[in-house]
Amino acid sequence: AASDVYKRQEEVGHGACASAPEDVEELLSVDMGCVGEGLECTDRQVSICVKDGHGPYHYDVVKGLIQAAKDNHIDYAADVYPYYGSDADAALSAGIDARHGLIGPGVYASHGYERSHKDAVAATLELLKAYLA
């Protein structure tokens, strides 16, 4: 059975870590997609993170997300974020043994005056719907 966990804290090592069911099999973190130098994502796309500063995301999750985007003609970019960590990473660090992934709308200026485009938000929602179908 699927479970939803919603949290409002950001990258602080609790929330999803503390409230995920013991038998969780997959974690999909929905955050922001990075936009900037050396990255493929724009502020009009959904970003699928392949790897971040904690290591690679689960191959089958990333592959499934990319395939769902392709099959549904969703504008996406697959990127590596070398200086980033997600709530899914924090959950794995806390000992949760689950497949994990990270997606989000492309966003400029993280932790500043963040800017994105409604197309990126729509693409993120469409990817969520397609992947979870």
Task: Annotate the PLM regions.
Residues 19-38, 102:
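A glycine-rich helix N-cap at a beta->alpha junction
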Residues 7-9, 26-28, 80-84:
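A short linear-motif detector with a strong N-terminal bias
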Residues 7-13, 33-34, 107-109:
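Acidic, glycine-rich active-site loops and adjacent beta-strand->loop/helix elements
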Residues 10-18, 85-89:
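Glycine-rich, charged/polar anion/phosphate-binding loops
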Residues 2-6:
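Short, small-residue-biased leader/transition segments that mark boundaries at the very start
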Residues 15-18, 39-41, 114-115:
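Short acidic, glycine/serine/threonine-rich loops at helix termini
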Residues 47-133:
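Active-site-adjacent substrate-binding region
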Residues 38-48:
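Active-site loop ensemble at the mouth of alpha/beta enzyme cores that anchors a bound cofactor
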